[in-house]
Structures are given as structure tokens and as C-alpha cells.
């Protein structure tokens, strides 16, 4: 991310819902939220979900800490996470005219030591423009070229998940991931960031399950 445009200005953020399948769910959720470090983040927890805004690295660190703390109780927990970067799509976007897609550094998370299974989907919301089938993506503002193939970055992301050893299977409307919670979140976030280097507005959604009684 450049120093001229903050993550908030570029619309970098997350919205997530933590679900705990236990009668003591209120305490477990509140304790998990309290256990995470909010430094450098804007956090707003409402009656439906929690909004987080900040750098990609800090957002994912916070999510890992909250989910890990809840899972440490041993009860079945799940988290529904939406990550978004780029405009339009965010109430606080202040992106100057003419700004193309902005890249960001890949995130790195410390191993959690707890298994997570997930369903993951990636949505590039603006196809890159290519002058021909082999050229690099171009800014849309020129009005020339043909739409890029939006499936191309999705297939690349799935390939990356396979290379990382996190890919488990292809399910209906989602890719199944399986591994350490940190590795799952890294795979999801770094694919989201990588696509965002060429496509300004990118959204990814992941549902994570831990300690599930369902055997797979």
C-alpha cells in the first residue's frame, strides 16, 4: 500500500461473524474478542457482525487471534469472513480519480497449531483489461482492449492453495481448504491481495469450521 493512500481510503476491510455451538456462547465470543489485539484497527461489533478496517496484515492477525481463542475452548466454532479491498463498495472510500489497482505485501501469520476446515470463494469484481490475449492487464480508463478472463486469477489462487498443501477439494460453489488456521487464512488473504494488484475491487469469502463433530 502506498503512503499516499491509507487502507481505509482504499476500502480495505473485513466483516465477520463468529458462531459458537455451545450454551456458553456469549462468554466464549466476548472472551475471544477481548483476547485479540486491536492495535491499528478500527473495530465495530454490532448485533449481526463485526467490522474491521486497517492494513491487510493487522486485519488477518486479529481474525486469527479471535478465532483461535474461541477454538481453544474445544467447542465447535465457525467463522464467516468477508474480506474486501478497493472501491466502490465501501462507505468510507476516498479514492482519488484515476487511481488504478494498488498492490500490497503478502501477509504472514504465526502457526496456531489448530486444524481448520473451510469453504472459500474469490470474487474479482472488475475484470482487468488486456490489449490482447498475452499482454499485461491495463487500466480501464482508456476505454480500449477486451475484458480479461475473471476466472484466470481464481484458477491461479486455487493453484496456489494446492502448492501450499491447503487445498482439499472442489465443492459446489466453493473450494475446500484444510490445514492450520494460520495457513488457511494466509492462503485466502494472499490470493485476495494478489488479485488486487491488477483488479481494483476484490472480495473473498470464507467460512471456517473448527472442532466440528462431523467427521470428514
Where are these regions (language model features)?
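Charge-rich, low-complexity N-terminal segments
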Residues: 2-216
Amino acid at each position: 500500500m502506498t503512503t499516499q493512500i491509507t487502507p481505509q481510503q482504499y476500502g480495505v476491510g473485513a466483516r465477520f461473524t463468529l458462531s459458537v455451538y455451545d450454551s456458553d456462547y456469549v462468554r466464549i465470543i466476548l472472551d475471544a474478542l477481548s483476547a485479540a489485539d486491536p492495535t491499528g484497527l478500527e473495530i465495530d461489533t454490532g448485533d449481526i457482525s463485526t467490522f474491521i478496517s486497517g492494513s491487510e496484515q493487522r486485519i488477518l492477525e486479529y481474525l486469527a487471534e479471535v478465532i483461535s481463542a474461541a477454538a481453544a475452548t474445544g467447542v465447535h466454532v465457525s467463522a464467516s469472513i468477508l474480506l474486501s479491498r478497493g472501491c466502490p463498495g465501501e462507505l468510507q472510500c476516498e479514492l482519488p480519480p484515476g487511481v488504478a489497482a494498488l498492490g500490497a505485501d503478502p501477509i504472514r501469520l504465526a502457526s496456531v497449531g489448530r486444524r481448520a476446515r473451510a469453504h472459500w470463494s474469490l470474487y474479482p469484481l472488475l475484470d482487468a483489461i488486456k490489449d490482447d490475449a498475452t499482454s499485461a492487464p491495463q487500466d480501464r480508463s482508456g476505454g480500449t482492449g477486451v475484458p480479461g478472463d475473471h476466472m484466470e486469477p481464481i484458477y491461479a489462487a486455487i493453484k496456489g492453495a494446492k502448492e501450499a498443501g491447503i487445498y482439499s477439494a472442489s465443492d459446489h460453489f466453493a473450494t475446500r481448504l484444510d490445514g492450520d488456521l494460520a495457513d488457511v487464512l494466509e492462503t485466502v488473504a494472499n490470493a485476495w491481495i494478489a488479485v488486487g494488484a491488477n483488479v481494483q475491487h476484490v472480495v473473498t469469502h470464507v467460512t471456517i469450521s473448527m472442532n466440528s463433530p462431523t467427521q470428514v
